[in-house]
From Swiss-Prot:
The chain crosses the membrane at residues 245-265. SUPFAM superfamilies: Chaperone J-domain. GO terms for biological process: chaperone cofactor-dependent protein refolding; protein-containing complex assembly. SMART domains: DnaJ (SM00271). Pfam families: DnaJ, DUF1977. Residues 1-244 are cytoplasmic. It comes from Mus musculus. InterPro entries: DnaJ_domain, DnaJ_domain_CS, DnaJ_subfamily_B/C, DUF1977_DnaJ-like, J_dom_sf. This is DnaJ homolog subfamily B member 14. Interacts (via J domain) with HSPA8/Hsc70. Forms a multiprotein complex, at least composed of DNAJB12, DNAJB14, HSPA8/Hsc70 and SGTA; interaction with DNAJB14 and HSPA8/Hsc70 is direct. Acts as a co-chaperone with HSPA8/Hsc70; required to promote protein folding and trafficking, prevent aggregation of client proteins, and promote unfolded proteins to endoplasmic reticulum-associated degradation (ERAD) pathway. Acts by determining HSPA8/Hsc70's ATPase and polypeptide-binding activities. Can also act independently of HSPA8/Hsc70: together with DNAJB12, acts as a chaperone that promotes maturation of potassium channels KCND2 and KCNH2 by stabilizing nascent channel subunits and assembling them into tetramers. The lineage of its organism: Eukaryota, Metazoa, Chordata, Craniata, Vertebrata.
Length: 379
């Protein structure tokens, strides 16, 4: 189950990269694959937005900088009359500053998008497309533009989801609905924890970002996701990267090589235990025995009985039982975690079949742990 989860997370990451590159079809395929492997909320949230918006994504025209222009140059789509310059000398207009202040002063998501409380999906999409392009940090360099962009993304994420919109309408304001406004991402099923970033949402609508070299990070306190736009590299830079590539790979692999060497040395220096919880023909531990106290089955070699008697045998059996109980306890925890995850996913996605599957899990290790606990109490 955990292996499937890792593969599902890889698929989600590939989907994010595809969205950044403007390839929505590829992103959709990998998100659907992730859904089949493991029910990740992030995959479901991204897929819902893609499916809901259909072919509208990417239909709007981006306001791009002309080829060869630098970050210090004024965007071709900007208004005349700048009111100042942001970091790196990036210019912004008075209208942009006023727009950012207006968005950040809004007390609820309907005000942010400029729609009424009975606005439908098309109204929300139209409002989001207009505002997202206007306040994207690659186009709008006014102070606070990044926060405004996050706010617009969260507003659409909440209001476009019927359940979250209903829940939000009960609270009445953004502050009550989400105590962490600057988290930057909104969870479609668990309050304001992150499932989809403002950049992911933007990429779904517009099929990629603006062609600049800037990086915008949106964090929710647990994990940070960065969206980096593509840089143009000269031929000389590519040659330097290739020359340094081999050495960089070696440096990255050094910790792994050291760990492998330490592990091998440890195995050579430490003698094998005189028992195994499972039959091991390679070490000759194939003779079945059972502890006197808890009745735990273990396996030893043919010379064991002659070497371990009396007190030595008692110490070995105590060690066997401790290893066995630890193993059972760990496996029981994994079983409970798996069942909890499946029950939660079934509740979130309203999947009755998944709920029945979770209820039907055998929990063999937990049953064995209960048996051992009762023996301890009985003793």
């Amino acid at each position: 189950m955990e292996g499937n989860r890792d593969e599902a997370e890889k698929c989600v990451q590939i989907a994010r990269e595809a969205l950044s590159a403007g390839n929505r079809d590829k992103a959709q395929r990998f998100l659907q694959k992730a859904e089949k492997l493991y029910p990740l909320p992030a995959a479901r949230a991204l897929l819902e937005i893609i499916m809901k918006n259909g072919s509208t994504a990417g239909s709007s025209t981006h306001c791009r900088k002309p080829p060869g222009s630098s970050d210090q140059s004024k965007p071709s789509c900007g208004k005349d009359g700048t009111s100042g310059a942001g970091e790196g000398g990036k210019v912004y207009t008075k209208d942009q500053v006023e727009g950012v202040l207006s968005i950040n002063k809004c007390k609820n998501y309907y005000e942010v998008l400029g729609v009424t409380k009975d606005a439908g999906d098309e109204d929300l999409k139209k409002a989001y497309r207009k505002l997202a392009l206007k306040f994207h940090p690659d186009k709008n360099h006014a102070p606070g533009a990044t926060d405004a962009f996050k706010k617009i993304g969260n507003a659409y994420a909440v209001l476009s989801n019927p359940e979250k919109r209903k829940q939000y309408d009960l609270t009445g304001s953004e502050e009550q609905a989400c105590n962490h406004q600057n988290n930057g991402r909104f969870n479609f099923h668990r309050g304001c924890e992150a499932d989809i970033t403002p950049e992911d949402l933007f990429n779904i609508f517009f099929g990629g970002g603006f062609p600049s070299g800037s990086v915008h990070s949106f964090s929710n306190g647990r994990a940070a996701y960065s969206h980096q736009h593509q840089h143009r590299h000269s031929g000389h830079e590519r040659e330097e990267e290739r020359a340094d590539g081999g050495f960089s790979v070696f440096i990255q692999l050094m910790p792994i090589i050291v760990l492998i060497l330490v592990s091998l040395l440890s195995q050579l220096m430490v003698s094998n235990p005189p028992y195994s919880l499972y039959p091991r023909s390679g070490s000759g531990q194939t003779i079945k025995m059972q502890t006197e106290n808890l009745g735990v089955v273990y396996y030893v070699s043919k010379d064991f009985k002659s070497e371990y008697k009396g007190t030595l045998l008692q110490k070995v059996e105590k060690s066997v039982e401790e290893d066995y109980v630890t193993n059972i306890r760990n496996n029981c925890w994994k079983e409970r975690q798996q069942k909890t995850d499946m029950q939660y996913a079934a509740k979130v996605y309203r999947d009755e079949q998944l709920r029945r599957k979770a209820d039907a899990l055998s929990m063999e290790n937990c049953k064995e742990l209960e048996r051992l606990t009762s023996l301890y109490k009985g003793g």
